[in-house]
Amino acid sequence: ASYKVTLKLDDGSEAVIDCDEDSFILDVAEEEGIDIPFSCRSGSCSTCAGKIEGGTVDQSEQTFLDDDQMEEGYVLTCVAYPTSDCTILTHQEEEMIG
């Protein structure tokens, strides 16, 4: 299956990508030329963090976020697969760390 992922970028613009259920959101965004920050690419830091505004993802491979952060909607886009159409606010590392 493929899902529409709407990325709300830090400059106020939005980008919509078609992301397969077995593709990481960050990888597809990069292929489309969308600038999302990243560092480790393995779900063990917070550089690529986003916040889900709607829809669902599978980020079971991540090791950085705690349960509270995930309940608040934070997502590591480098290890997140879409499980529905979803909307993600990008560039959320500073907001998340506070």
Curated annotation (Swiss-Prot):
One of its GO terms (biological process) is electron transport chain. PROSITE patterns: 2FE2S_FER_1, 2FE2S_FER_2. Residues 3-94 form the 2Fe-2S ferredoxin-type domain. Its main location: plastid. Ferredoxins are iron-sulfur proteins that transfer electrons in a wide variety of metabolic reactions. Belongs to the 2Fe2S plant-type ferredoxin family. This is Ferredoxin. It comes from Bryopsis maxima.
